[in-house]
């Protein structure tokens, strides 16, 4: 089989092509889509590797392998390797070949100041011509060829995600409350400062409690500023989250910060978790809530 997407089969994507044509960008994009990626696997080992993955009991369903000129000594029996894949039951595979014209590849090598692996002491063009000859048979086996000559990395990433991303693939959102006095979280993709909201810390009965307590949450939520802020914030997130999902982002960390991370940020984080939990996989966590007890 040569088409990806059969739920009952292990999906194997083989990525090959010219050095400098974008294989690294492709693999990074596939990793973000949840593919199990293996770089520089000799072609002769592909059937054995596929068999091992099948024996994993379905824990690995989508695999991407990169094969290139680093394994050139194993390219001689490529036809035998492909025939072995064709005869494997429960395997759906697709070969993607990334290419670019000589001028573009030479330009990319000059920009990165890297030497072509087949021309360590000569011009990049000599190595490019040698690589084309080496990969000629592999290109003939490809189910799809993408010419990246006119593509920027972000455009190639978008194409890979659109083609191999699963429709409706889940975006996992971690809403994280924190206190600025303990430092901002370094892994937050989006961060919102709610220190302008009314502070329960100055209400004696509420001070020992947290934003998870109903009376504290009610105190924070009842104010006009909070209601207006949440309306604008939910509108913003409601617009941006689907776009993050379409771009292939699998995880998003939203930081909500107040002074100590005990009252306001906790209440707002809990509210956002409820608001977006119906449409996304949402996890709410409170980094600093217990530090203030």
Curated annotation (Swiss-Prot):
Molecular functions (GO terms): ATP binding; GTP binding
Q: Name one Pfam family in it.
A: RapZ-like_N
SUPFAM superfamilies per UniProt: P-loop containing nucleoside triphosphate hydrolases
The UniProt annotation places GTP binding at: 68-71
Query: Which InterPro entries does the UniProt entry name for this protein?
Result: P-loop_NTPase (IPR027417), RapZ-like (IPR005337), RapZ-like_N (IPR053930), RapZ_C (IPR053931)
Q: Which UniProt keywords apply?
A: ATP-binding, GTP-binding, Nucleotide-binding
Q: Does the keyword ATP-binding apply?
A: yes
UniProt keyword GTP-binding present: yes
Q: Which family does it belong to?
A: Belongs to the RapZ-like family.
Query: What job does the chain carry out?
Result: Displays ATPase and GTPase activities.
Quote the NCBIfam families the UniProt record gives. PRK05416.1
- Report what the protein is called: Nucleotide-binding protein BBR47_52620
Q: Which organism is it from?
A: Brevibacillus brevis (strain 47 / JCM 6285 / NBRC 100599)
């Amino acid at each position: 089989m040569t088409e990806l997407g059969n739920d009952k089969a292990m999906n194997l994507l083989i990525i090959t092509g010219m050095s400098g044509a974008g294989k690294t960008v492709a693999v990074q994009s596939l990793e973000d889509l949840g593919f199990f990626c293996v770089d520089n696997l000799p072609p002769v080992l592909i059937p054995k590797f596929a068999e091992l993955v099948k024996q994993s009991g379905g824990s690995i369903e989508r695999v991407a392998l990169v094969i290139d000129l680093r394994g050139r000594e194993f390219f001689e029996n490529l036809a035998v390797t492909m025939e072995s894949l064709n005869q494997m039951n429960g395997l759906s595979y697709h070969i993607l070949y990334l290419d670019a014209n000589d001028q573009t590849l030479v330009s990319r090598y000059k920009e990165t100041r890297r030497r072509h692996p087949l021309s360590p002491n000569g011009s990049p063009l000599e190595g490019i011509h040698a690589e084309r000859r080496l990969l000629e048979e592999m290109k003939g086996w490809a189910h799809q060829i993408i010419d990246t000559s006119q593509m920027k990395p972000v455009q190639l990433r978008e194409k890979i995600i659109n083609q191999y991303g699963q429709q409706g693939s889940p975006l996992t959102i971690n809403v994280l409350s924190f206190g600025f006095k303990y430092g901002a979280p370094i892994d937050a993709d989006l961060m919102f400062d709610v220190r302008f909201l009314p502070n329960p810390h100055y209400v004696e009965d509420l001070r020992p409690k947290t934003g998870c307590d109903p009376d504290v949450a009610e105190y924070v939520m009842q104010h006009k500023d909070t209601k207006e802020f949440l309306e604008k914030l939910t509108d913003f997130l409601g617009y941006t989250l689907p776009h993050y999902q379409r771009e292939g982002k699998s995880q998003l960390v939203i930081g909500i910060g107040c002074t100590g991370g005990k009252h306001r940020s906790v209440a707002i984080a809990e509210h956002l978790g409820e608001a977006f939990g119906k449409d996304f996989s949402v996890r709410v966590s409170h980094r600093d809530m217990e530090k203030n007890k």
